[in-house]
Amino acid sequence: MSIRGVGGNGNSRIPSHNGDGSNRRSQNTKGNNKVEDRVCSLYSSRSNENRESPYAVVDVSSMIESTPTSGETTRASRGVFSRFQRGLVRVADKVRRAVQCAWSSVSTRRSSATRAAESGSSSRTARGASSGYREYSPSAARGLRLMFTDFWRTRVLRQTSPMAGVFGNLDVNEARLMAAYTSECADHLEANKLAGPDGVAAAREIAKRWEQRVRDLQDKGAARKLLNDPLGRRTPNYQSKNPGEYTVGNSMFYDGPQVANLQNVDTGFWLDMSNLSDVVLSREIQTGLRARATLEESMPMLENLEERFRRLQETCDAARTEIEESGWTRESASRMEGDEAQGPSRAQQAFQSFVNECNSIEFSFGSFGEHVRVLCARVSRGLAAAGEAIRRCFSCCKGSTHRYAPRDDLSPEGASLAETLARFADDMGIERGADGTYDIPLVDDWRRGVPSIEGEGSDSIYEIMMPIYEVMDMDLETRRSFAVQQGHYQDPRASDYDLPRASDYDLPRSPYPTPPLPPRYQLQNMDVEAGFREAVYASFVAGMYNYVVTQPQERIPNSQQVEGILRDMLTNGSQTFRDLMRRWNREVDRE
């Protein structure tokens, strides 16, 4: 009764699909029952073959001897703690050898020449029989030490973690943002002489602590990866491409820690518009206009869903009330069978209407979201094409940075593109001056496919959509408290930002007043990550809703309303979705 294929001698073959690691069957096996062999292999053995297997039961009490071994003094062996320590050393050595044997068992068989070459190199390097064992990386080894130290401090010695509180839940990316911000704060204090040497030194120390925290989190991540997949054979669930982006299957998602990087997410419509011809640009603009018109015409149908959801809820409540009043339960099934001749009761009618209403709302939310993505991508492509068309067909007026007039020396293709652009401007609501010029701010955002709402850029749009934009021009302690209160962290603006500013950090543009800071005990009990991601999700949904629907700012739904309507879409629905999908199918198929 032994585990074959995972033997302790390190020379066994790879276990096959039937659990037998060798071509010939063992002589000790009775019969040809593979199920019995597999059941027997679940139990550990005390034989020499399975003694170094990782599946063997580790008996610690048998390793702690009562008598001192050779080479040790009686005084050192007299204490219980010293004997227990020696037993732990033996357990650690046994686990190390078991890992080595498991590695040699799972690894593929190599030729005799390769093994001879490796044995020769191992004898020269004095590594012995562990030449086939892959050592830990320095980062993973340090992460294991850090994890063991944290476990010993928090669980054994009952000490608090050095990063306890709300900031202890930050991941590597968020800690890296905090390190970058604290270092920039220290530079800002020192450059503008806003603090003395002691204050600057304290800020530098905090920045160093955050940098050390980033390194610790990176090493712990490497250690967790090693523990979850020690052989490096498992395929990762996601492949990260850019910070904040991950792919699951064929779908790309964005869950980054930076609100300012939302416009940099590659959603599939990122085109180099400067390499396209005038005819292609004109076609992209027209396609974007058709997609935008389709979305605008679809909004009344989507708004009609609220009434259908309310009717479904009323039907459900009526059915529940009727059932409770009439006592229509499973116990009264016999009475109901006798009443079949008299017709269905009110409770049965209400329940049947509820079932019919539920059966009438069947739709595919996956295709619904896919069509929304395709149409929004076409709108963004048309916007980017319009930005490039402005560069080609319009010239900037003198004395103004955002007023454009059509050029006179245009080719026939360019003139056609200018006409398409004029229709695009009229449909977008861009006013034309008396002299025939257009007032178009921030054309660069158009060329990237980022919507420009009410003459404001993308950064300003996200600031307005946030309930309260945090103030960056504060001292360190107030800044940290305010960041916890807001539930997210905002990066300082880039140095190449195109709008002029009076300071290194922007003042809030939000119309809402700045609230007073809550007490410290409330700050320490707030959940940073949940509110942080909620703010990112709300700003993104509000941006898409405001751009597609072109409604006033006060009609932007908050995250709770958006989450509720999405949940209703997943669980409920109506014929409106089928009509909507039929219309969107016709629009998507048009090319």
Swiss-Prot record:
Compositionally biased region (Low complexity): 110-132
Segments of this protein annotated with the region Disordered: 1-37, 110-135, 324-344, 487-517
Composition-biased stretches (Gly residues): 1-10
Bias kind Polar residues: ranges: 11-32
Cysteines engaged in disulfide bonds, as pairs: none
Coiled coil: none
Domain of life: Bacteria
Compositional bias annotation for Basic and acidic residues: 490-507
Protein family membership: To C.muridarum TC_0268.
Protein name: Uncharacterized protein CT_875
Source organism: Chlamydia trachomatis serovar D (strain ATCC VR-885 / DSM 19411 / UW-3/Cx)
